[in-house]
Amino acid sequence: MASERQYSPVDRLLLQADAALRTLLPFSGASSRPSPAIVQAETDLNPEESRHIAGLMRINHTGEVCAQALYQGQALTAKLPEVRSAMEHAADEEIDHLAWCEQRIRELGSHPSVLNPLFYGLSFGVGAVAGLVSDRVSLGFVAATEDQVCKHLDEHLEQIPEHDAKSRAILEQMRIDEEQHANSALAAGGVRFPAPVKFGMTLLSKVMTKSTYRI
């Protein structure tokens, strides 16, 4: 069996810079899977519906920016090669979500949040620190983060009208993927975070959702 390619520190920094650019630059993230919205018919939305749904999709897009940064930060400092590989694979799947959300936001006549670079930097730092503590903590942070994302997706699916089949199809597939990421992280040995830690993460996520809904 071929051994895993060994990257130098400079190589890894260049890979991280490439990942950041692909995450933050418009239309730079190419999905490996077609958007679930492609097979859904477009329906007429009134201006208020379009504005609200675009705001929700902007939140989800920024959430994927944060997840991408979190995974990249953890991959940079993960101690075990298999954990690093798992983080990089999960980050690749998040690129799909980024591309799907951005495409839908544009279709609704809006744009991604201008705060994305800020949230990327913060999330990357958190991921790198978690990876330095231990791989089990790093994996646990993934599981807890994905749980938060799933809650946001459930809330948004309740708000998006049934006739917006395109947006709903995207969020439903994202929900499946995120739950799988959380379960995989726990199965790989991630620690289950206590309720107080999860509560703190919920408060921080509210800052993101409130700010990116409009800008």
Swiss-Prot record:
Annotated keywords: Cell membrane, Iron, Membrane, Metal-binding, Monooxygenase, Oxidoreductase, Ubiquinone biosynthesis
Principal place of residence: membrane
Keyword Iron: yes
Locations listed in the record: Cell membrane
GO molecular function, a single term: metal ion binding
Catalytic activity: a 5-methoxy-2-methyl-3-(all-trans-polyprenyl)benzene-1,4-diol + AH2 + O2 = a 3-demethylubiquinol + A + H2O
The EC number(s) this enzyme carries: 1.14.99.60
Pathway assignment: Cofactor biosynthesis; ubiquinone biosynthesis
Keyword Phosphoprotein: no
Signal peptide: none
Pfam families for this protein: COQ7
Bound cofactor: record note: Binds 2 iron ions per subunit.
Database matches in InterPro entries: COQ7_proteobact, Ferritin-like, Ferritin-like_SF, Ubq_synth_Coq7
Recorded family membership: Belongs to the COQ7 family.
Name this polypeptide is given: 3-demethoxyubiquinol 3-hydroxylase
Gene (UniProt): coq7
